[in-house]
């Protein structure tokens, strides 16, 4: 049995962000991932957007950590972790007067969420069509917001993991946590893959287990928060007709459900989606269904009529973990054990927020931290 100072359960972008943040300290840190590869659940199956902060309710943790996380990505992590990315504006489009009114509310929300006034403007129909010539000409107005970035979330997760590995964080795949017990010394004894004896012992545990974060806390008997699922499906189109998309195009989120985008990916293909389907069984959140594909096509065509869905090359699905009580991030110590750190409810903008969430998780560990003299935070995956 290995004794670890801090054990992280979950190898998505949240877990690997925690590993990277902890890698700078003189600690024995390990990360456990149940799958063969890191980041192959929620972290892989999302839009890959570092959000500007236009959408979250200012009173929610999602807004707070969106602002903080985006700042860390741009001002710190992007300088140390080199992988493909593109700075891009967001364009939220309105097709009637009711939606146009929502643009003003979104603008006010964005300003409350610390978006600079000069980075957010309402465009009339003509200005919108100049910005996006291929957009539906029935558009009446749009809200343009500067400051988003497109990244590949799977490559970002990989870069965080490799940077952590080079600083002696241990990362294990195919290690499914099946039971956690607490011994008489208040250590967590972690059982893997239904084995009868524990493989790891730790004083501090970070629960970054995505959809199963609530199960992990419950099975450890430290907390009873509950999550549900919100599945989203995407279509990826081969851009064979030189369709130029200059921004990340959204429908008005307060009416149509946040998250549906038409955007040009880093590889030049066109991403359309996701839709939102509530309450799917956790083990079925990656499934593809025809109803969702048709819904995505309808919304995509409304935004950009010249989208050629016959050029679809693949579809994928993923799901956001939703905290049932708050519909917000859950970032705190467990109710009955301060050494168990819960990072739950990791819906959008989880990717954007991940650096700030990781820093908060380290604070919640309440450890006396000593920095490594030879910490190397830099890693380059630009060749991918």
Curated annotation (Swiss-Prot):
EC number, UniProt record: 1.1.3.21
Binding sites annotated in the UniProt record for sn-glycerol 3-phosphate: 47, 51, 258, 320, 348
A family per Pfam: DAO
InterPro entries associated with the record: FAD-dep_OxRdtase (IPR006076), FAD/NAD-bd_sf (IPR036188), G3P_Oxidase/Oxidoreductase (IPR052745)
Membrane topology: Lipid-anchor
Entry annotation: catalytic residues: 51 (proton acceptor)
Example GO molecular function: oxidoreductase activity
GO biological process, one term: glycerol catabolic process
GO cellular component: cytoplasm; plasma membrane
Pathway terms, separated by semicolons: Polyol metabolism; glycerol degradation via glycerol kinase pathway; glycerone phosphate from sn-glycerol 3-phosphate (aerobic route): step 1/1
Binding site for FAD: 14, 33, 42-43, 47-49, 177, 346-347, 352
Main location: cytoplasm
Keyword ATP-binding: no
Subcellular location: Cytoplasm; Cell membrane
Keyword Signal included in the entry's annotation: yes
Lipidation (N-palmitoyl cysteine): 18
Known catalytic reactions: sn-glycerol 3-phosphate + O2 = dihydroxyacetone phosphate + H2O2
Co-factor requirement: FAD
Source superkingdom: Bacteria
PANTHER family: GLYCEROL 3-PHOSPHATE OXIDASE, GLYCEROL-3-PHOSPHATE DEHYDROGENASE
Assembly notes: Monomer.
Function: Catalyzes the oxidation of glycerol 3-phosphate to dihydroxyacetone phosphate (DHAP), with a reduction of O2 to H2O2. The formation of hydrogen peroxide by this enzyme is crucial for cytotoxic effects on host cells. Does not show any dehydrogenase activity with NAD(+).
Name of the protein described by the UniProt record: Glycerol 3-phosphate oxidase
Organism: Mycoplasma genitalium (strain ATCC 33530 / DSM 19775 / NCTC 10195 / G37)
Lineage: Bacteria, Bacillati, Mycoplasmatota, Mycoplasmoidales, Mycoplasmoidaceae
């Amino acid at each position: 049995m290995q004794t670890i100072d801090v054990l992280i359960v979950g190898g998505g972008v949240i877990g690997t962000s925690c590993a990277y943040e902890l890698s700078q300290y003189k600690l024995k840190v390990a990360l456990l991932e149940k799958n063969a590869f890191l980041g192959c659940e929620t972290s892989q199956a999302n839009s890959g957007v570092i959000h500007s902060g236009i959408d979250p309710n200012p009173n929610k943790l999602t807004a707070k950590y969106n602002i903080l996380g985006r700042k860390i990505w741009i001002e710190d992590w992007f300088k140390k972790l080199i992988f493909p990315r593109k700075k891009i504006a967001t364009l939220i489009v309105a097709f009637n007067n009711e939606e146009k009114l929502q643009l003003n509310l979104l603008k006010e929300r964005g300003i409350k969420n610390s978006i600079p006034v000069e980075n957010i403007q309402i465009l009339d129909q003509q200005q919108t069509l100049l910005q996006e010539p291929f957009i539906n000409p029935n558009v009446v107005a749009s809200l343009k917001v500067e400051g988003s970035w497109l990244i590949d979330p799977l490559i970002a997760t990989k870069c965080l993991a490799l940077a952590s590995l080079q600083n002696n964080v241990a990362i294990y795949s195919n290690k499914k946590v099946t039971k956690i017990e607490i011994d008489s010394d208040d250590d967590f004894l972690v059982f893997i893959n239904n084995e009868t004896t524990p493989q790891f012992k730790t004083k501090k545990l970070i629960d970054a287990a995505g959809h199963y974060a609530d199960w992990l806390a419950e099975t450890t008997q430290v907390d009873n928060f509950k999550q549900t699922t919100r599945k989203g499906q995407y279509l990826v189109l081969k851009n064979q007709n030189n369709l130029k998309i200059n921004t990340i195009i959204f429908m008005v989120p307060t009416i149509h459900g946040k998250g549906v985008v038409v955007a040009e990916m880093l590889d030049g293909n066109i991403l359309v989606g996701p839709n939102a389907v509530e309450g799917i069984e956790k083990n079925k959140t990656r499934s593809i269904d025809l109803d969702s594909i048709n819904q995505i096509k309808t919304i995509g065509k409304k935004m950009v009529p010249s989208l050629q869905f016959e050029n679809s090359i693949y579809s994928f699905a993923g799901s956001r973990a939703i905290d049932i009580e708050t519909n917000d991030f859950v970032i705190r110590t467990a109710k009955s054990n301060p050494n168990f750190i819960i990072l739950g409810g990791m819906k959008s903008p989880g990717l954007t927020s991940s650096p700030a969430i990781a820093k908060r998780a380290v604070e919640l560990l309440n450890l006396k931290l000593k920095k490594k003299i030879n910490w190397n935070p830099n890693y380059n995956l630009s060749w991918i």
